[in-house]
Amino acid sequence: MRTLLLSTGLAALVAAVGPAMAEDPSTDPAADPTQLPPVTVLATRSETRTDEAPATVTVFTARQIEAMLATDIKDLIRFEPGVSVVSQPSRFGAALGTTGRAGNEGFTIRGLGGDRVLMVVDGVRVPDGFVFGAQSVGRGGYADLDLMKSVEILRGPASALYGSDGVAGAVAFTTKDPADLLRSGESFGARARVGYNSADEGVTTSAMVAGRGGAFSGLLAWTGRDSRETGTQGSVGGVGSARTMANPQETRSDAVLLKAVWDIAPGHSLRAGYDWFESDTTADVLSGRSASVLELLADDETRRHGWNLGWRGDRVLGLDRAQASVYAQQAETRQFTFEDRNPAVDRTRDNSFDNEVVGFAADAVKTLGVHRLTIGGDVSETTQQGVRDGTVPPMGETFPTSAFPKTDYALAGLFVQDEIGLLDGALKIIPAIRWDSYDLSTADDPLFPGARADQSGDHVSPKLGVVWQATRTVQLFGNWAEGFKAPTPSQVNQFFSNPAFGYVSRPNPDLSPETSRSLEIGARLREVDLFGGRFSGQLAGFRSDYEDFISQQVVSGAFTPADPAVYQFVNFTDVEISGVEAKADLWWDNGLSARFAAAYAEGETTSDGVTTALPTIDPLKVVLGLGYDEPAGRFGGQAIVTWSQAKDAADTDGLGCFNADPALGCAVGDDFALLDLTAYWNVDDRVTARVGLFNVFDETYSWWSDVRGVAATSAVLDAYTQPGRNVGLSLALRY
């Protein structure tokens, strides 16, 4: 299957190059991208202004990422209500407990996260998350922001254009191209940057070079980061479970990007890329020490590398545009833990989770009168395997072993979208539909002791978007979409047996896909005269219904050796979420600007006939900003206030927090307000210095996404707090 995918994809690319070279050269010069308004490709698979998209999309450009002094995805969404990233403190164990082991776990969009949010890097899916026992693998640590040209976040189902996993939303990372470093008419460009963040004593160093010669251009980029543990506001040190200071930790990461572009003819190009990411984190988990555990050490490694070959042609074969790509990616995570015990024998855990994928994708655009058709498809095959190893295994087990068998996971899909322009383009109706198939094929695996099962199925995902430019300044939009998520290999075939303690976990080949239906309706104002400046804003409301959510449940048994409890992943939960989001910008010709953003949502989950509040939704969050950019562009800055409401205690029912007094329930945090300051100085046209002062008033606070599930009576709540007052610095040089 892999050989077939690669050979078919390469053949398609080669076939496309010939017609491209025969096309008439285009006389339209490329527009300067710095003069264009923010655009999204994620929303409609074609470049669309974010204020003309039928759904809410946020685009972070490389310049914005640098201006925020963001070093990871949690920094990236710092000022983005409605989106969060779970990142708990490292307080895990060797055989039990996963708190903080996954690092930045991934994005949560409008209350749902994990594998329910599609994440791609240059169109290639980020590997699944995985949790089993003390092993926990997140999805937010596979890419380095310094290498990104843009990051797009789409709210709402994305399956009609992108297939499985786009149940709650999608996030697309796009890496830099040679043209991003090369100024018009120049044949060479370079950039170097150093940065520092006191929150984790992190030092970032990056270097990029790009060159152009004739029809060829290339890019070589590298970023290295060294950091320690992210600080907390906890004051209890020492060893043991009462510790609230962050456990000592050191992280080293390196990322490399190579790109080569051949401009075959004007508007037609062939490009090849290779990217490599590596991260190594060592931790001394002092909070895990006790009278019986003398030392707890961890070493976690993440590796991802991939290559891609793509072709794009404008006005080829009678089409407005066509593009195709073939790609391969390998991702490996390894989590090693050593536990020095007394009097028990020392033990280790050496767990891995590996993903290898190859794929091919293509799409084309054709305008026919008032119709702008986009049609395309993609196919991929992922080989997924997880191995549990170490010493002193649990009673009844032998190492090495696997929680699920080695699985080939194939996805294929075809889609069509029609952008219909009516009323001289003032009204756009955008229907789309996609058919997807999925197939899980297991292989004989000597490390998997259970009975294995294969599974396959298909799904159809429609959507309908509408954008109406009612007046020059007023726009109405709406988007109805369905999403789906196919079961993962570990959900279908997870197996574990511990008869001595009376429980087992068994495969379930009858799992159905998770599905969603979402409606978003909103209004936009664009460049309205207000207070002597120009005002733009958006107000949107949404309602989403999710069915057949997959969760692990006890389906039978009595927790005895004779009648063990049987755990199984089943379609168990239905979810309803509704909310409202708003954002606005006001700016003046003298360089002053103001911004506002807010998001509020509520939801409920129904499991086995019992309805409770959905605890994964973030509480109300409001962001207010005031900025100044000197008209000549030499210097500027922002003051940003972020206010977050405490979680309603009634919304934590069903979280399962353990308390000495059950009436106290789960921790809900407090209302808090933060002030962050950022500033920049363009020393000249080649040197830019930036500084940020975050949490200016040294507020003690926790994000709900991090403290969720912790008991209200916990003595270590301060361990989940964010850093106090901290500084970020950056110096960039361009040539």
Q: What are the residue ranges of the model-derived segments?
A:
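A beta-strand signature from Gram-negative outer-membrane beta-barrel systems
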Residues: 141-191, 734
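Extracytoplasmic beta-strand/coil segments of soluble accessory domains associated
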Residues: 74, 78-125
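Flexible loop and strand-edge segments within Gram-negative outer membrane beta-barrel domains
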Residues: 247-249, 267-322, 330-355, 390, ...
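Membrane-embedded beta-barrel scaffold of Gram-negative outer-membrane proteins
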Residues: 228, 319-339, 477-481, 510-570, ...
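Transmembrane beta-barrel wall of Gram-negative outer-membrane proteins
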Residues: 198-227, 237-281, 303-313, 421, ...
